[in-house]
Amino acid sequence: MTISVPATSANLGPGFDTLGLALELKNRFSIKPSSLSSIQIRGEGSKNPKLRVDNIFVRIFQETFAKLTEERTNFRFQFHNQIPISRGLGSSSAVIIGAISAAFMMAQKKATPEEILSLALAYESHPDNITPACVGGFTVATTRENSVFYIQKPLPDSIKAVVVIPHRPTSTSYSRQTLPKRYSMRDSVFNLSRSSLLTAAFFSERWDLLREASRDRFHQEIRMKQFPALFEVQHTALKEGALMSTLSGSGSSFFNLCLKEDAPSLAQKLQDRFPKFRVLELKFDNKGVVRDD
């Protein structure tokens, strides 16, 4: 059995812990019953020996499978990872959603997206990445107790993402510690109004509103100061045709949205300006986690 889970970009500027979308950059997980347990990793993380000793996917899969079947079975795990680790592109959420979904499939039990997301909250308390990883598209999500409430909007082929990926990783937990505990009324209204406008812009496909609607006063500038080159990435992207340019999650990647016809030029100009960074031109994913075999 093989499943795939897309990368995600969350926050999207003002939508802190709430807004996210899925990208056509995927991790693929293959699981097969075996006499002995084994793990094989290709792609991102393949050179990290810790991922073979304490693998989060394997742990979550086995915990979920045991709850569903009350069985302890050995499996052979094969991972083909395209999502960069610790770069703000939802690699952890892909693992969580993938492991829970795979456990249900292997146990031959059906699960709704709501059920998968509810279980995922035990491992990730913020819904902005796990929701688009599960259902694809652009998502608005919130939580109450053990439930995720969300709405999803498929993204059209007329827009694309250009993602700039520095080689420097970022720790989400450390990044959160640098943020203020309180915000002024002025900044709160600034973000609330733009988060609302950004959501409406995505649902109505008013791409002309994205630049203003994606401005933020909660987290981006503070996080970007840890890696000042990101200010230049954002400036260059907006100058060269991006409709919006935002820190992806807690970073260090930067998400840029543009019209489909502008994507090759924007990607090339960003690559020329930042030759030491990876630049990927990506479609959006509207399916979320899917079974591939």
From Swiss-Prot:
Role, per record: Catalyzes the ATP-dependent phosphorylation of L-homoserine to L-homoserine phosphate.
Top-rank lineage group of the source organism: Bacteria
Cross-referenced PANTHER family: HOMOSERINE KINASE (PTHR20861:SF1), HOMOSERINE/4-DIPHOSPHOCYTIDYL-2-C-METHYL-D-ERYTHRITOL KINASE (PTHR20861)
PROSITE patterns: GHMP_KINASES_ATP
Keywords: Amino-acid biosynthesis, ATP-binding, Cytoplasm, Kinase, Nucleotide-binding, Threonine biosynthesis, Transferase
Protein name: Homoserine kinase
A cellular component term, taken from the record's GO annotations: cytoplasm
Annotated EC: 2.7.1.39
Gene3D superfamilies listed in its UniProt record: 3.30.230.10, GHMP kinase, C-terminal domain
Taxonomic source organism: Wolinella succinogenes (strain ATCC 29543 / DSM 1740 / CCUG 13145 / JCM 31913 / LMG 7466 / NCTC 11488 / FDC 602W)
Pathway assignment: Amino-acid biosynthesis; L-threonine biosynthesis; L-threonine from L-aspartate: step 4/5
Positions that bind ATP: P84, I85, S86, R87, G88, L89, G90, S91, S92, S93, A94
Family recorded in the similarity comment: Belongs to the GHMP kinase family. Homoserine kinase subfamily.
Localization (cell): Cytoplasm
Record's catalysed reaction(s): L-homoserine + ATP = O-phospho-L-homoserine + ADP + H(+)
A Gene Ontology molecular function term of the record: homoserine kinase activity
GO biological process: threonine biosynthetic process
Disulfide topology: none
Enzyme class, spelled out: transferase
